[in-house]
């Protein structure tokens, strides 16, 4: 008999088949903005958004490199290929160095990174043979690529942009001009360096036994090695040249809108390129153009310009490493925005909205240029986004400065600001009034009404109702506060609103279940200072995290630590916050406040009511439901987290995957808790993997359970093998018996009971050893 799978069951099977094992990490670096590339035989290495990918020019295979599968670090600043050792030298912004060989093996050199120096900024890397000359903010560091060791450090005291060995003389282009020293002399002695000229030089290269240099703002010159005279070859005009390099028989000089090919002192040709090129690599008759918007494009000469001959290379990835806000839609898609609350009017992140589809593992980056063209205004600092619960594919996104943007099927359709809606600008008049329509948050309620926080104005709360009409709510306590940010309608029907900084704190309104009528509300606000149950008061400067857990308790994350409201009625009366006390268990009987003094930026609640706490500079914590137990503490030292500065957290409650947004990009961790079901149903209970094959070493997951579900695993004879309690809707079994031994091949039954001991349901697992 052929059975048809329901779409819901098919979705479950797809999710299970692609589900990572508990404890697995995934990173999501952006590979979008291509800035540099290197040719290595039939392979093209591309530096994009601080990440690395390669393209095989023979079989068209693309490989993505990250700090889980290959690399030792993140945030690459420079790459350079050495033909002598057949390896790519990778330099990171923190001065860490990887050597990636053609056979995909890798060697890390962290000596320079670990040195204590006033500055370790690396400006460039020039490779000649098996020597890498690293130009730094203080001079030149020489790396022997054969022996994988630093052979010399020349502390010239000048900010050095480029280094080149020519006729036994080492040339450096610095902020103070060009210097050189003979390799026969002791170059550790600054007196053995001579100043050639005072022109700030960006790059050197050699052609036909002559030395050429690129002088900032001026152009490309030949530098006579004997008399130090400069001869102009090509003058900088329009977009300035980025660099110069030898492609074999020619010098190549790329700029944003052109590339010049120099064959001799008197022979050169300039070709137009696509606007926005950050680097162009010549390989035979082919050019590879790196572009901020379109990735890497293969081009060839077509009359007086370079023309693309293939579709751009741009791996599917986030458009940027911005992820200040993250939220899951009802159908399991992750929405990400990259804006910041530009309170001081000095940070302008490009308008960034991204969607990650877990079922296809694909990213979609919302359009940007069309918005700027349509509105005639900047498109920056997108702080939040939400999907209409009554119309999938209908989105609203907020900007801290330019109002609200409406999208349908990911296409921009309308901007709302002070001119066409009740939204208000912080400034009532002036030339830049349109820049100050500050909307940190938009969020739909269950009825399809869009709640908008309009900070810094009189009527902070604006509601775009489902019927298209607008409603403004006034609370005098919130008028003109500079960073009112997030609304929360709790399980009691109370409205809470946070103020982040400037005047940080909490506002609460008992709405009497009349949300759109404020006249019958009881209201209170707590600003700048919090007092705990022991009478200790804290000055609060930032309040970024506020969330209700599954028990109705409210968790507040501030710059000075973690606070709890476990009885909202009492809190409304006395304004006393609770700080959890964690016993020291050292015989003193003393306890410490949980996470006291820790700067908290984000909090999320998982399916087992556990708390994921993101900090400003100390990574992310997982706490037990009551906060008394620290289950995990992940940092860049013990995990692939891109940074210890955690901006946002979003949890896929179906899979248990925790997405973590940092100031340097995103990662996810597969946890052991999912959202619980309301009741046990054998059709919803699944084991993964199933069957369990001999080469599998991870945990076996049983999903589709109720909260605090009792799970027993027995063999075919009915003997108890393992038992425990589910975390949310999931139970994890390590495939071992009570003695810690791996169970043998066979069929094992999973017996499940709810927290009252009722409704026993069975599924089974096949294990093959």
Which residue ranges define each predicted feature?
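Hydrophobic h-region of N-terminal signal peptides that target proteins for export
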Residues: 12-19
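Glycine-centered coil/turn sites that cap beta-strands in beta-rich domains
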Residues: 679-712, 730-733
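Short, glycine-anchored, charge-dense loop/turn motifs used at functional sites
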Residues: 710-721, 748
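Bacterial N-terminal signal peptides that target proteins for export
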Residues: 1-9
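Short, surface-exposed loop/turn motifs with a glycine/proline- and acidic-biased composition
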Residues: 67, 726-757
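Edge beta-strands of extracellular beta-sandwich domains
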Residues: 760-765
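Interdomain boundary/hinge segments at the C-termini of tandem beta-sandwich modules
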Residues: 767-769
């Amino acid at each position: 008999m052929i059975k048809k799978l329901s779409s819901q069951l098919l979705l479950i099977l797809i999710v299970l088949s692609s589900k990572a094992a508990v404890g697995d990490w995934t990173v999501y670096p952006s590979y979008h903005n291509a800035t540099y590339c290197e040719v290595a035989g039939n392979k093209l290495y591309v530096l994009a958004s601080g990440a690395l990918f390669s393209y095989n020019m023979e079989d068209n295979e693309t490989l993505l490199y990250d700090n889980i599968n290959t690399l030792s670090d993140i945030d690459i600043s420079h790459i350079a290929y050495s033909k002598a050792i057949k390896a790519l030298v990778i330099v990171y912004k923190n001065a860490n160095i990887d050597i990636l060989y053609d056979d995909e093996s890798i060697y890390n050199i962290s000596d320079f990174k670990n040195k204590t120096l006033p500055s370790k900024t690396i400006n460039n890397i020039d490779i000649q043979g098996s020597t890498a000359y690293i130009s730094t903010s203080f001079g030149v560091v020489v790396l022997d690529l054969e022996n994988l060791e630093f052979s010399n450090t020349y502390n010239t005291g000048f900010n050095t942009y480029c280094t080149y060995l020519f006729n036994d003389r080492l040339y450096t282009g610095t902020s103070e001009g060009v210097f050189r020293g003979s390799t026969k002399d002791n170059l550790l002695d600054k007196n053995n360096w001579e100043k050639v000229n005072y022109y700030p030089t960006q790059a050197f290269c050699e052609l036909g036994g002559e030395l050429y240099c690129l002088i900032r703002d001026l152009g490309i010159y030949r530098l006579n090695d004997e008399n130090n005279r400069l001869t102009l070859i090509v003058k900088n005009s329009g977009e300035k040249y980025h660099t110069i390099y030898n492609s074999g028989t020619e010098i190549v000089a790329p700029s944003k809108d052109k590339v010049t090919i120099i064959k001799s002192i008197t022979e050169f040709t300039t070709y137009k390129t696509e606007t926005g090129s950050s680097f162009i690599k010549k390989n035979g008759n082919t050019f590879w153009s790196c572009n901020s918007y379109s990735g890497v494009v293969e081009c060839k000469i077509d009359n007086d310009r370079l023309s693309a001959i293939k579709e751009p290379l741009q791996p599917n990835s986030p458009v940027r490493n911005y992820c200040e806000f993250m939220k899951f839609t009802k159908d399991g898609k992750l929405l990400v925005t990259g804006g910041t609350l530009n309170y001081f009017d000095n940070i302008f992140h490009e308008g960034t909205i991204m969607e990650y589809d877990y079922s296809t593992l694909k990213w979609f980056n919302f359009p940007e240029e069309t918005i700027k063209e349509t509105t005639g205004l900047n498109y920056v600092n997108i702080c939040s986004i939400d999907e209409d619960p009554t119309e999938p594919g209908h989105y609203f996104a907020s900007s801290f400065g330019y109002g609200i943007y409406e999208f349908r099927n990911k296409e921009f359709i309308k901007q709302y600001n002070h001119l066409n809606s009740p939204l208000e600008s912080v400034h009532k008049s002036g030339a830049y009034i349109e820049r100050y329509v500050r909307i940190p948050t938009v969020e739909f309620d269950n009825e399809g009404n869009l709640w908008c926080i309009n900070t810094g104005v009189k009527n902070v709360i604006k509601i775009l109702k489902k019927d298209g009409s607008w409603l403004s709510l006034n609370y005098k306590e919130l008028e003109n506060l500079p960073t009112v940010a997030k609304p929360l309608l709790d399980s009691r029907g109370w409205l809470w609103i946070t103020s982040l900084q400037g005047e940080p704190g909490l506002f609460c309104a008992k709405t009497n279940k009349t949300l759109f009528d404020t006249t019958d509300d009881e209201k209170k606000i707590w600003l700048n200072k919090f007092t705990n149950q022991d009478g200790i008061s804290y000055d609060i400067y930032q309040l970024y995290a506020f969330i209700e857990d599954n028990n109705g308790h409210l968790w507040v994350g501030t710059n000075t630590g973690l606070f709890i409201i476990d009885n909202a009625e009492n809190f409304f009366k006395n304004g006393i916050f609770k700080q959890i006390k964690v016993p020291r268990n050292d015989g003193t009987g003393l306890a410490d406040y949980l996470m006291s003094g820790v700067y908290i930026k984000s909090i999320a609640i998982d399916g087992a009511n556990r708390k994921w706490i993101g900090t400003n500079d100390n990574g992310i914590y997982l706490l037990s439901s009551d906060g008394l137990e620290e289950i995990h503490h992940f940092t860049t030292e013990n995990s692939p987290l891109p940074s210890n500065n955690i901006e946002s957290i979003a949890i896929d409650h179906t899979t248990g995957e925790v997405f973590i947004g940092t100031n340097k990009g995103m990662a996810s961790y597969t946890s052991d808790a999912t959202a619980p079901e309301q009741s046990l149903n054998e059709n919803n209970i699944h084991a993964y993997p199933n069957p369990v094959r001999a080469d599998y070493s991870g945990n076996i997951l049983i999903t589709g359970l109720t909260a605090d579900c009792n799970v027993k695993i027995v063999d075919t004879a009915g003997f108890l093998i393992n038992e425990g309690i589910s975390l949310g809707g999931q139970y994890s079994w390590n495939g071992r018996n009570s003695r810690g031994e791996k169970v043998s091949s066979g069929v094992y039954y999973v017996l499940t009971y709810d927290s009252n001991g009722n409704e026993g349901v069975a599924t089974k697992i096949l294990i093959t050893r």
